[in-house]
Amino acid sequence: IHIDVDKCVDGCTACVDACNEENGLTGFGRPETDSQWIRKVKIQDNTTNKISTMPLMCQHCENPPCCDVCPTGASFKREDGIVMVNQHTCIGCRYCMMACPFKARSFVHETLTQQNTNAPRGKGCVESCNLCVNRIDHGAETTACEDACTKAGHNAITFGDLKDSSSKVSVVVSSNSPRRLRNDLNLQQKVFYSNI
């Protein structure tokens, strides 16, 4: 994923709303504990005082610390690089939540009803952005957040296959000199940001 922070609009929640709808994430009015697979954050450049807003989600690290600390292997990285949680083997210890430097994981505290059958979830499990695998595995080429951002007219999010040098996201990443968040951690994330 590539995110152009200059195109991300303060106050817009199109990407968050689309993710919530796609994955059946309904809040209980408790922002501190409600599941957030993607959230909008504000950052400030201390040298210029520029304040920007941007979406923050699982960074799909090449070297994911969440997988390293998981005692059951429930946190895992697929061959295509997508980092996921196996709801059947997650024991809810939340070590992965503590290990994630991006606070990109949520814990399901409540019993869930009326779930989206494409994205089953379970009480007592950890969860995070899975790059809409329910769509991608069935041939879709975009995520819900990208579609929503495009529909809103911002075009801040570009999704695709970073291993395909001719893909739209690869072209954007190679031409914009983007950076990774907390590059000092050497996690080799697959989410890139420009203009931050």
Segments the model singles out, each with a brief description of its role:
Residues 1-196:
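Non-ligating segments of multi-cofactor redox enzymes
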